[in-house]
Amino acid sequence: MTEDELQTYVVHWLQVALPLGSVFHHSPNEGKRHVAYKMRLKKLGMAAGWPDLEIFVPETGWRDPADQGPIMVELKRPKGGSLSANQKDIQERLKCCGVYCVTAKRLAHVEAYLKPLLHLRGTSQADIIRQMCEA
């Protein structure tokens, strides 16, 4: 499975499993680009190594309201995927700012990380997506 395929499953799962009122976003900062375009994006604030998904959850979605904060998810392909030096640096800096960060190679890793923090919705759609991803 590619990282893009994994992210597609994770996005579909988040849409049906996150607490109501949650929002998430993907900043398309991966891939090869023309040098001039990369420079433009950098001027606009793009940071190399930024996680794949940013998740924001309303207060009522947290198991412990004291745990509130942004959640960042970095996805890696299941076989051979590893964090770059920029990604490691960004994750450490985000953690110092009180941001939850996880690196995951499977949907099950994302779910296991979020389950103790959030009131996830248990839906049949979430179950189907999980089964499809793990197949």
Task: Report each predicted region and the residues it spans.
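Catalytic phosphate/metal-binding cores of nucleic-acid and nucleotide-processing enzymes, i.e., regions
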Residues: M1-A135
